[in-house]
């Protein structure tokens, strides 16, 4: 029994040695793609890698992507399985959500991807990436379509979520608002489940700046993914009724005071410079038309011109009585005087 056992051991060692010394499969001598990475931003699911460069081949290298779920077999990433074609492609990117944001892998599934390069009958070794779950590993962006409506001492904020969640019982968004009076201290209000938030008790007619932030909560694994802040935007609150009334009163009083000052200044100037003002507004004397014509044409008799132009209404005379005395009576009267 011992010689038989010894020969069996020697035979097994020979087989292992032959297998170890055998050259690798020539069909798998293609370099593998380098630095593959999966991008999970909002609803996006994109796999990218660096291209395989070959100096001795003019044919393009193509790539094949496969995926698997927990305890499942490997599937080829094609139209039938995932909705996009990532088989025999020359691109160095596979966008699983290219068809629509709702496409791609289920966000709560455990997904593993692998990738290899191919050139004719040659292919590289598979490059397997670590598994991921979208809700666990996603980068959440800021809320979108932010609209702010100023109110009386308030700001009403409306927006949409970073991406749609099919089943809100397993995962949902809550929101926070970071706001501050311009030049003041920042405050945070939240969390809110609603996509409409009202900031109340703000000072009227003041400028406030704000940023909105989303946070993803996955109930199944009790995971929180804090999102990015939105861009800073500033708005001025409206004045309330009492403030508007005060402004109207102040404007009215200011206008009346200004008009009073202007009226007083004008009256003072009129008194001080009345002679000059009278001189400015006095109508200069004019020569009668008949005399002006006579000066232009001295040969024209002035009296005839006046008689010609005068109207009958202007020919008015007083009655004149001529009393004559005899020469003797006239001397007596003179002596009496």
UniProtKB/Swiss-Prot annotation:
GO terms for molecular function: cytokine receptor activity; type II interferon receptor activity. Keywords: Cell membrane, Cytoplasm, Cytoplasmic vesicle, Disease variant, Disulfide bond, Endoplasmic reticulum, Glycoprotein, Golgi apparatus, Membrane, Receptor, Repeat, Signal, Transmembrane, Transmembrane helix. Changing residue 168 to N: In IMD28; does not affect receptor trafficking to the cell surface; loss of function due to gain of N-glycosylation. Expressed in T-cells (at protein level). The keyword Cell membrane applies. Residues 1-21 form the signal peptide. Residues 28-247 are extracellular. It is found in: Cell membrane; Cytoplasmic vesicle membrane; Golgi apparatus membrane; Endoplasmic reticulum membrane. GO terms for cellular component: cytoplasmic vesicle membrane; endoplasmic reticulum; endoplasmic reticulum membrane; Golgi membrane; plasma membrane. InterPro entries: FN3_dom, FN3_sf, Ig-like_fold, Interferon/interleukin_rcp_dom, Type-II_Cytokine-TF_Rcpt. Its main location: membrane. It comes from the Eukaryota. PANTHER family: INTERFERON GAMMA RECEPTOR 2, INTERFERON/INTERLEUKIN RECEPTOR. Belongs to the type II cytokine receptor family. Associates with IFNGR1 to form a receptor for the cytokine interferon gamma (IFNG). Ligand binding stimulates activation of the JAK/STAT signaling pathway. Required for signal transduction in contrast to other receptor subunit responsible for ligand binding. This is Interferon gamma receptor 2. It comes from Homo sapiens (Human).
């Amino acid at each position: 029994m011992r010689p038989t056992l010894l020969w069996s051991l020697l035979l097994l060692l020979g087989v292992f040695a032959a297998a170890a010394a055998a050259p690798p499969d020539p069909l798998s001598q293609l370099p593998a793609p380098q630095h593959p990475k999966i991008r999970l931003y909002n609803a996006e699911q994109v796999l990218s890698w660096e291209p395989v460069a070959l100096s001795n081949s003019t044919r393009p290298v193509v790539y094949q992507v496969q995926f698997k779920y927990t305890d499942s077999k490997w599937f080829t990433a094609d139209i039938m399985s995932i909705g996009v074609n990532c088989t025999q492609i020359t691109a160095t990117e596979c966008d699983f959500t290219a068809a629509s944001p709702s496409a791609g892998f289920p966000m709560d599934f455990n997904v593993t991807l692998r990738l290899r390069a191919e050139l004719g009958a040659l292919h590289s070794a598979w490059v397997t990436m670590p598994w991921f779950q979208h809700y666990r590993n996603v980068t959440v962006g800021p809320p979108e379509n932010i609209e702010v409506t100023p109110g009386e001492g308030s700001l009403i904020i409306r927006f949409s979520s970073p991406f749609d969640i099919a089943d809100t019982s397993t995962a949902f968004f809550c929101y926070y608002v970071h706001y501050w009076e311009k030049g003041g201290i920042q405050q945070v209000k939240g969390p809110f489940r609603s996509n409409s938030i009202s900031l109340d008790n703000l000072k009227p007619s003041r400028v406030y700046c704000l940023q909105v932030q989303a946070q993803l909560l996955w109930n199944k694994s009790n995971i929180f993914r804090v999102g990015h802040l939105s861009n800073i935007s500033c708005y001025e609150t409206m004045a309330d009724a009492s403030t508007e009334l005060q402004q109207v009163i102040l404007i009215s009083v200011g206008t009346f005071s200004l008009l009073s000052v202007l009226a007083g200044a004008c009256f003072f100037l009129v008194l001080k410079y009345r002679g000059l003002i009278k001189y400015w507004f006095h109508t200069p004397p004019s020569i009668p038309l008949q005399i002006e014509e006579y000066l232009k044409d001295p040969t024209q008799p002035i009296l005839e011109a006046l008689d010609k132009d005068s109207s009958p209404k202007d020919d008015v005379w007083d009655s004149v009585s001529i009393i004559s005395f005899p020469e003797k009576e006239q001397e007596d009267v003179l002596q009496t005087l």
